[in-house]
Each structure stands twice: as C-alpha cells, then as structure tokens.
Amino acid sequence: MKNQICTILGGGGFIGRYLVRNLTKKNYRCIISTRKAFQKGYLKTQATPGAIELVDWNPNNFSELKEAIKNSDVVINLIGILYETRKQKFYNIHTNIPEAVAKICADSDVKKFIHVSAIGANENSKSLYQKSKYQGEVKVLNNFKNTVILRPSVVCGTEDNFTNLFSKLSILPVIPVVGINYKFQPILVDDVADAIVKAIEQKGNDCLLYTSPSPRDNRVS
C-alpha cells in the first residue's frame, strides 16, 4: 500500500497538517490542495523533497480539481467550514463540493475516497451545518462506491480553535457558560489522522461510515 499517491483537499488546515506528517512517514506521496500561500512554506517542511506536491485549487474550479486528482490512488476530503460567510455557504462547501469530488473520483482511477464529515450529521437536524454535512454524505455515497466516511467529534490539539478559545476565556473575570450540563466529547487530532491512515490501508470495497467521539465525556457546567 506504500508509495501510493494521496490527494488531500483542504490539506493545509488543522487536521491536514497532522495527516500529511503521518502519511509521508509511511512513504505515501501527498498532493495537497491549498489556496493560502502562507501555509505552503510550512507544508514543504513536513517531508523529504518530492514527497509533497502543492497545488493551487479554487474549490469552485472543477477543472483544477480533475487535474489534482487524475493520478491519485486515494482522495481525502477535509474541506469544511464552521460558520457561513458572504462567499462561503454550508450547502456549497459541505454538499456540492463533496458531490463533485465523488463524481471525479468515479471517472478517474481513484481506488478509495475518504470523506471527513462531522458527528451529528443528520437529515432532520435544525442545524444547517449538520444538515449540510449529512446531505454531503448522501451525495458522496451515491456517486462513488468505495467511500469511507468519518464523523469525528470536536477535534482538539495544541493548535485548534476550540480548546484555545477556552484558554483565552479563562483570563476573563467572568467566563460565559454555553450550557449547563452540556456534554461534549472532543477527539485528539492525532487520533483523527491515525483513523484516516487506517481507513486508507483497510482492505475492501464497501461504503463504510465511522463515528469517532472521544471515549471520555466532558461536561460544561
């Protein structure tokens, strides 16, 4: 399974940086899509020369996407947003783009598609975020057979936005409480990266879905 080519969409983000380290240590070649120039210098230091190829990709330019994917054995989609902006909407990022990626994988020689969704993805959710994640899963499964979907919980680590927000709040004289007895189960980014590598190396051609919370509950009270 080694020396395969993995195209990582959104590979310059938080999870992507850890995943690239894991993959290159196992001698995978990584094609990383990123639009942010400041990330590129950092990514090039993650492996020996030739192990990483950086490509510019506008998520709405599917011709560029085809070019990035055409020689890949595995495609990993890490693209996602936590909130909408004027230019970035949940439905486009979480539903339309995964569907387009799955279709391109089906038309290429891609052997496996790893789609990272989110815990709580649900068709009937009142959250547009969770609903768009679920719809993206359906589109992916309808268009590419050999798909693994991962639903990680809140991903935490030394560079994440979630736990660092609590760290910043701790210096305030009063800390806002987001919900009494609200439970959450964050998962370490290292564990998410490990799970993706295992999904790549797992044999089989069936569509699989994994929900990945931490084994320990945490409570906001």
What is each model feature region?
Residues 9, 33, 78, 113-118, ...:
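SDR active-site strand-loop-helix element
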Residues 161-162, 179-200, 208, 212:
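Substrate-positioning beta->alpha
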Residues 210-221:
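Single conserved hydrophobic/aromatic residue that forms the stacking wall/gate
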Residues 33-37, 58-59:
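N-terminal Rossmann-fold cofactor-binding loop
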Residues 6-26:
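N-terminal Rossmann NAD(P)H-binding glycine-rich loop of SDR-like oxidoreductase domains
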Residues 48-99, 104-107, 119-123:
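NAD(P)H-binding glycine-rich loop region in Rossmannoid oxidoreductase-like domains
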Residues 117, 138-164, 168:
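Conserved beta-loop-beta element that borders a ligand/cofactor-binding pocket
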Residues 91-95, 114, 133, 185:
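Short alpha-helix in the Rossmann-fold core of NAD(P)-dependent oxidoreductases
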